A protein has these predicted regions:
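Condensing-enzyme catalytic core mediating Claisen C-C bond formation in acyl metabolism
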Residues: 1-23, 140-219, 325
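A glycine-/small-polar-enriched, mobile loop at the entrance of the PLP active site in fold-type I
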Residues: 14-24, 53-55, 274-279
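Claisen-condensing/thiolase-fold acyl-transfer catalytic domains that form or cleave C-C bonds
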Residues: 27, 31-34, 38, 57-58, ...
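Membrane helical hairpin/interfacial module
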Residues: 45-57
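Conserved beta-strand elements of the Class I
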Residues: 49-52, 110, 247, 308
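Active-site-adjacent elements of ketosynthase-type condensing enzymes
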Residues: 58-68, 116-144, 150, 180-200, ...
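Conserved beta-strand-centric core segments of catalytic alpha/beta enzyme folds
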Residues: 94-184, 291-325
């Protein structure tokens, strides 16, 4: 496509991305992340009594991918709920998990988030994209990718998994949560072609690229900065604290410019709102979990730290969560 490494880095902060192998679905990637999370938590898979699975790129139209993860983990029969808040899935999943645990319906919840974006990208020659071969692509393919450059340079594939457990530790866990959904701005980023309204089996629609994400980048950036800043302030106000009392703000990794603008709005230094988008791109539902895992293993999160999770995704959905680790 007509772009350059400099153009991509300047506008997104992305230096590299990773793509799943052909035929590798979110069930497989999610199960691998889940295995690591289970080992890290020091639990047995049989202790899991509920699964939440977030993706916008499921293995199949139906069933959802949650039961597929359970099967791979050897715990078929555990209830699995797939959620669809796209890039905003983490704070929504945290709210659902907290409710299940508080009600006594579950004690150990596995939350898996995974997305693979091959079907959402304007590339036809994936061997070239993955670097398996070097060859000139047809002019038509070059122009098609360039026309969808706004989304083609952003998304990467990835999976994350988190174990949520009941605790008796005073003041630990989810403290405050603020969630919003606004269908009036669904057109900021969406895929027109789907199922009931614009059938996925219509060849004319497919030829028009209606199966690819359509994004109003400027509108989305402004909405993200405004919503995330407002939501962060809302949960802090509810808790009676200011930004200086939050140890880390862990935000969805959509675009470095968004997170920089949120940091400026909240008067945060860069280290208070860490980023890994340069290494992975936007892995949609998986970004917060991946960043959380890295921060933990780097020793940047300790027991008792106060975290603020922030995310906005297609819908529009947005959420902020104050969480005592």
């Amino acid at each position: 496509m007509d772009t350059s490494d400099e153009w991509i880095r300047k506008r997104t902060g992305i230096h590299q991305r990773h793509f799943a192998e052909d035929g590798q679905g979110v069930g497989e990637l999610g199960a691998r992340a889940a295995e690591r999370a289970i080992e890290d938590a020091g639990i047995d898979p049989t202790e899991i009594d509920f699964i939440l699975f977030a993706t916008m790129t499921p293995d199949h139209l139906f069933p959802g991918s949650g039961p597929l993860v359970a099967e791979r983990l050897g715990i078929s029969g555990v209830p699995a709920l797939d959620i669809r808040q796209q890039c905003a899935s983490f704070p929504f999943a945290l709210e659902v998990a907290n409710g299940l645990i508080a009600s006594g319906a579950a004690r150990t919840i596995l939350f898996v988030a995974a997305d693979t974006h091959a079907s959402l990208m304007p590339f036809r020659d994936w061997d070239v994209v993955r670097g398996n071969v070097s060859r000139t692509i047809p002019r038509e393919d070059f122009e098609r990718a360039t026309a969808h450059r706004g989304i083609a340079v952003i998304f990467g594939d990835g999976a994350s998994a988190v174990i949520f457990r009941a605790t008796d530790r005073e003041g630990a866990g989810l403290l405050r949560s603020e969630l919003r959904s606004d269908g009036g701005r669904a057109d900021h980023i969406f895929i027109p072609m789907g199922f009931s309204r614009l059938p996925f089996n219509d060849p004319e629609l497919a030829a028009s690229d209606a199966h690819l994400p359509q994004m109003k980048g400027g509108n989305l950036l402004k909405a993200a900065v405004r919503e995330l800043s407002e939501l962060a302030r809302a949960v802090m106000e509810q808790e009676g604290i200011g930004p200086e009392e939050v140890d880390l703000f862990i935000a969805h990794q959509a675009n470095q410019r968004i997170n920089d603008a949120v940091a400026a709005a909240l008067k945060l230094s860069p280290e208070r709102i860490p980023s890994n988008i340069a290494r992975y791109g936007n892995t949609s539902s998986a970004t917060i979990g991946i960043l959380l895992d890295e921060l933990r293993h780097e020793g940047r999160i300790q027991e008792g730290d106060l975290l603020c999770f922030l995310a906005l995704g297609a819908g529009l959905h947005a959420g902020a969560s104050l969480f005592r680790y």
